[in-house]
């Protein structure tokens, strides 16, 4: 995270590989870069690029580039944000196929809140991404986490991610739930 006045740059990188008795059970990676600028106080823009793969979802590569109009309103000790935008998507599957390039609308609503002087933080975001040329082909994702400050800069963050794809690739389930527990040290 890099924040300066009206600009916020966010980079997230993750890679997960799991092997049990010589057999892979997880192999995925994710990279996301976003630039948010609040031009008019409550209104601004988000621009992003993203790349990912997931061996166990037959996803060789998925690349996104897009942008949003972002509207933000304070809420207690947090905020609620709404994003309305569009993105290009390139998707290639391991077994061939995939849709190649397509365009999707991408919309989100996000809620963040803090309690106990910031020792407990919650974030919840929902995304809805219908294909521009076929609204019956859509993806929905809900992501949430609670950050609990334990001591100093050390926190634990239980989190979840639920994804739904109305028209997934052949052999891939329509929905997926991930539950994780992160530990973070902030200095």
Indicate where each model-derived feature is located.
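Solvent-exposed loop/turn segments connecting transmembrane beta-strands
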Residues: 3, 19-26, 53-61, 94-99, ...
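Transmembrane beta-barrel domains of outer membrane proteins
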Residues: 1-3, 32-36, 50, 70-72, ...
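Outer-membrane beta-barrel "beta-signal"
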Residues: 175-187
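Transmembrane beta-barrel strands of outer-membrane/channel proteins
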Residues: 11-17, 31, 47-51, 67, ...
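Transmembrane beta-strands of outer-membrane beta-barrel pores
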Residues: 4, 15-19, 49-55, 71, ...
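Detector for outer-membrane/organellar transmembrane beta-barrel domains
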Residues: 66, 70, 79-130
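Gram-negative (and chloroplast) outer-membrane scaffold detector with strong preference
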Residues: 37, 41-55, 59-89
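Repeated loop/turn-to-beta-strand initiation elements of outer-membrane beta-barrel proteins
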Residues: 3-11, 41-47, 76-80, 114-122, ...
């Amino acid at each position: 995270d890099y924040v300066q006045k009206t600009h916020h740059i966010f980079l997230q990188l993750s890679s997960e590989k799991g092997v049990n008795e010589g057999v892979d059970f997880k192999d995925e990676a994710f990279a996301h870069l976003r630039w948010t600028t609040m031009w008019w106080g409550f209104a601004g823009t988000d621009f992003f690029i993203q790349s990912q793969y997931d061996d166990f979802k037959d996803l060789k590569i998925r690349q996104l580039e897009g942008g949003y109009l972002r509207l933000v309103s304070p809420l207690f000790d947090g905020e609620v944000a709404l994003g309305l935008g569009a993105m290009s998507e390139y998707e290639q599957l391991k077994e061939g196929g995939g849709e190649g390039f397509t365009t999707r609308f991408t919309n989100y609503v996000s809620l963040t809140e803090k309690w106990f002087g910031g020792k407990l933080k919650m974030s919840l975001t929902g995304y809805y991404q219908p294909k521009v040329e076929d609204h019956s082909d859509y993806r929905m994702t809900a992501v949430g986490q609670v950050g609990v400050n334990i001591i100093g800069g050390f926190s634990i963050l239980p989190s979840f991610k639920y994804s739904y794809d109305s028209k997934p690739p052949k052999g891939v389930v329509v929905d997926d739930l991930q539950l994780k527990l992160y530990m973070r040290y902030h200095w």
